[in-house]
């Protein structure tokens, strides 16, 4: 419901103060709605069946072979614990029975597609694949290139550290390249006011519906705060109103894949849409300067400075504040 501005009560000082407070609330809400009205992602229920790996399938079979009638553990990448019933034909999970999977490959996640356990991967010019990790939260690969860091900590916890840099509580945030949605999920956990997320790749969007660590925009817990759109942010940024966001999370693909998201033109747009004092975290990774011939983080820092930010290296990227 739109807050009342209390205009009829302006003659008293208390009602003036109330009206001004309501006006600030309404203004902040309207700033979010100044973001472009791209088509939202059609509601696709998130998968709730078992997610299998070669190791988890072997674990269930060993338990059955030892005579166990059930097994307790997680078949949703560590998000919850369930009691799984075991029999000669397969296993029962959340009131549904599944046959024993056939031969499974290493470093591959499988979901029940209604007929069999199928790998969570697609090929549309590039092979895109959801990949299990020792941390629970998966990463994903494009043509064998890992898109999220996993060597030292969970990709989800890595995202949380970066999101904390922009202090998301109560803010309107632009998430330029949604990916698996870990930035958005961590911002939601931290009490973000609204977050608008774009994703260009339809196959990555499909991965999200199968990943229990990816936030569901339609879930009750999200409270309508996550608006997820299929779109190219390098184009959509032109439609976003100036000064309409409080903070930005920018996690683009590698420079060689999406150079337009590292361009001065794009950075100028980021500076335009964020309010003065707003924070931006730009993930760059740590590309090898000797093999690549360039220092991408320093180049980003310099371009952001030219766009109107005060920028410095932080974690594996650049943290910038709008001057």
Mark where each language-model region is.
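Conserved SAM-binding loop of SAM-dependent methyltransferases across substrates and taxa
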Residues: 180-192
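Conserved beta-strand signature within the Rossmann-like core of class I S-adenosyl-L-methionine
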Residues: 277-284
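Class I S-adenosyl-L-methionine
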Residues: 288-323
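A short glycine-rich, Lys/Arg-flanked "PGG" loop and its adjoining helix->strand segment in the class I
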Residues: 264-276
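Conserved class I S-adenosyl-L-methionine
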Residues: 170-179
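S-adenosyl-L-methionine
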Residues: 201-240
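A short acidic, Gly/Pro-enriched loop at the edge of an enzyme's catalytic core
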Residues: 238-249
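N-terminal auxiliary segments of SAM/dcSAM-dependent transferases
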Residues: 36-132
């Amino acid at each position: 419901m739109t807050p009342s501005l209390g205009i009829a009560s302006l003659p008293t000082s208390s009602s003036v103060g109330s009206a001004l407070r309501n006006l600030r609330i309404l203004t902040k809400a309207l700033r979010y709605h100044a973001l472009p009205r791209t088509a939202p992602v059609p509601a696709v229920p998130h998968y709730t069946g078992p997610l299998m790996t070669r190791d988890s399938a072997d674990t269930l079979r060993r338990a059955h072979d030892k005579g166990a009638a059930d097994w307790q553990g997680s078949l949703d990448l560590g998000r919850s614990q369930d009691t799984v019933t075991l029999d000669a034909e397969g296993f029962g999970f959340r009131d549904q029975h599944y046959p024993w999977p056939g031969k499974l490959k290493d470093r591959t996640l499988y979901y029940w597609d209604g007929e069999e356990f199928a790998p969570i991967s697609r090929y549309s010019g590039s092979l895109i694949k959801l990949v299990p990790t020792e941390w629970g939260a998966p990463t994903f690969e494009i043509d064998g290139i890992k898109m999220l860091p996993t060597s030292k900590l969970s990709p989800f916890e890595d995202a949380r550290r970066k999101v904390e840099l922009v202090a998301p509580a109560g803010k309107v945030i632009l998430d330029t390249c949604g990916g698996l949605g870990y930035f958005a999920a961590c911002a939601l956990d931290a009490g973000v006011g609204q977050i608008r997320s774009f994703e260009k790749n339809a196959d990555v969007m499909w991965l999200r519906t199968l990943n229990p660590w990816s936030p569901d925009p339609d879930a009750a817990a999200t409270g309508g705060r996550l608006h997820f759109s299929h779109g190219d942010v390098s184009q959509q940024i032109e439609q976003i109103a100036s000064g309409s966001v409080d903070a930005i999370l920018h996690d683009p693909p590698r420079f060689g894949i999406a150079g337009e998201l590292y361009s001065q033109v794009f950075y100028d747009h980021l500076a335009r849409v964020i309010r003065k004092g707003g924070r931006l975290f730009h993930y760059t990774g740590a590309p090898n300067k000797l093999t690549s011939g360039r220092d991408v983080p320093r180049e980003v820092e310099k371009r952001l400075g030219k766009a109107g930010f005060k920028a410095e290296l932080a974690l594996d990227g650049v943290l910038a504040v709008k001057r």
